[in-house]
Amino acid sequence: AGLESGEIDQETLIEDTGEIVIDQYRYGNWYFDQYGKTEGEINLERALARSNDIFFYRLGEKVGVDEIVSWASKMGLGERTGIELPGESEGLVPTRLWKERTTGERWFLGNTYHLSIGQGDLTATPLQIARMTLAAVSGRRCQVSLLQDSEVECVDLGISSKNIEIVKSGMRAACATGGTAFSFFEFGPYVLCKTGTAQHAGQTSDEVLPHAWITVAYPGDNPEMILTVMLDSAGEGSYEAGPVAKEILGRWQEVE
């Protein structure tokens, strides 16, 4: 959303301050919370590689909730994928109107911060995240099917090839030395990935472990497979979901 709206480009720098405090509310970055350190001024590629919340909080503030919601919907969040399985959830992309109708409250900047990092009231299935990942690295939103030989229709989202390459570069860096997905360091530039750690709504991190996420695109130059792993209440994505995804990808390579 930030790239396509023109709010940022590859060179735009945002300072990682470690935390943002608004009245009694605090929004922190994991690196500061765990180690007391900040990243300085970073661009989008570095922010993706390091999973830097402060960058995306500030970016979300620049872009605005409506633009974020628009692109989330374009990339398939908040709707069923249509896979041939019963009981699929459509998930939820919260909007200003949704919050007003559901809670009777207006939308606050803190809600935008949460939405910008995929938390708060946003909900999504692993399959939706896989489809969104495909859209991010290819610019296409595709149908999903269990049938190997089925004809899958894809819609071109009109994302510029330059912006796609910027995102891929950041996801490539996330799997390389210095990134958050240390399980994939040995794969070098051949894998794109993004780790995630999703907290339970309404609960603090010491009450229950967060959900561990990672989404992977392989091979990195022209992805043919998207792999998304979510482990319920397992901990951090880097430590828990990453090794599982690595094992699955390794087995897939053996039979490829």
Per-range role (PLM):
Residues 132, 178, 241, 252-256:
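Intrinsic structural disorder
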Residues 232-235:
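A generic structural motif
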Residues 129, 237-246:
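Short, charged, low-complexity patches
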Residues 152-155, 244-256:
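Short, gly/Ser/Thr-rich active-site loops of penicillin-recognizing serine hydrolases
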